[in-house]
Amino acid sequence: MREILHVQGGQCGNQIGSKFWEVICDEHGVDPTGKYNGDGSSDIQLERIDVYYNEASGGRYVPRAVLMDLEPGTMDSIRSGPIGQIFRPDNFVFGQSGAGNNWAKGHYTEGAELIDAVLDVVRKEAENCDCLQGFQVCHSLGGGTGSGMGTLLISKIREEYPDRMMMTFSVFPSPKVSDTVVEPYNATLSVHQLVENADECMVLDNEALYDICFRTLKLTTPSFGDLNHLISATMSGVTCCLRFPGQLNSDLRKLAVNLIPFPRLHFFMVGFAPLTSRGSQQYVSLTVPELTQQMWDAKNMMCAADPRHGRYLTASAMFRGKMSTKEVDEQMMNVQNKNSSYFVEWIPNNVKSSVCDIPPRGLKTSSTFIGNSTSIQEMFRRVSEQFTAMFRRKAFLHWYTGEGMDEMEFTEAESNMNDLVAEYQQYQDATVEDEEEYEGEEGLDENYET
């Protein structure tokens, strides 16, 4: 079937990734040892379990996951965590040195030494697939390993499997919550790579996730566990159509075809409804209108950009649970008609919806939202400003040049990011003037006919 190969890199990527596997194991009825003990009544859980799992001897299911890091700490905690025993031991690839939040170490020195070991595991997993659909990579862009080594791996996989989909779940540096001083450097260098080598990037950031935890879930002290719970719900929603039967299916390629009008503009905002905290899931059952209303709400977006400040080029909604497709279509049309100014008018019907019959554990219905909005430029713009402020003074540059990088690379990354912002802006504005010219011509035609 259409397999997906999952790669997680760096501390952030590994923590999100292991949370994701907890959710997927739960949905497919796989216990922490890899044994299936779901509801025996139906084969739905097993029917397409091969999207994410290999079947090993003795009927055990093993995640098709590659775990990489430049230091052993996070790996050790995954191994001793709730699902540590389910992964294939050979698929843990780690160094001892760490990348020290330095993109150059992850991309050029330490990471480059480890990358062949990672690629061997990736190859082995890919060769076992019947029909590999693509890769999903979890990483952050602010550190050293996820950003530097993550993008190195993405470009190597791109070389070897040019026709497979490459999807990333990338955690961007947050505006207010900064983890390291050199985040703007690492993020800009990473985006420079992602623009060229990834097919679809789901943009996440911690601040937006914190806001959801405070505002919507009323958690007073959210932990990374709570944040990762939100992310993993979204990740599971994006691929549910592949794993469970549905009325309108979607896969990574269909998603890309429907969401990406121009190849460089593949950075998506994601949202999820209903937003629930880890403890309170069993009490929620929303109707289709409620799901729709929640999922288009700016407060539900998992990255710090406000869709009301831009326009949607395209969007995709994935509903889960027993519901009428007619109602889904009506609600989606309703959103577009009521908020038509927030959608570009030169792509008609730019919202795609899909429906999967099996809801996530503990909910009757849910929906995942993926939007390609021009307002995402706010995030790039913010990082770019911070980058420029430091780069102008050449602050912290010696850490990068010391690993063999050239200043030229920084300049290129900076201008690539600024080009990206300009492209988003261009398509955000590409409406009124073009429309007016067009209407003017039409007016002439009418006069001409009379």
UniProtKB/Swiss-Prot annotation:
Q: Which domain of life is it from?
A: Eukaryota
Keyword check for Lipid metabolism, yes or no. no
**Residues that hold Mg(2+) according to the record:** E71
Kindly list the GO molecular function terms attached to this UniProt entry: GTP binding; GTPase activity; metal ion binding; structural constituent of cytoskeleton
Q: Which residues are GTP-binding?
A: Q11, E71, S140, G144, T145, G146, N206, N228
GO terms under cellular component: cytoplasm; microtubule
**PANTHER family from the entry?**
TUBULIN
Protein name (database record): Tubulin beta-6 chain
- What organism, scientifically named, is this protein from? Gossypium hirsutum
* Organism taxonomic ancestry: Eukaryota, Viridiplantae, Streptophyta, Embryophyta, Tracheophyta
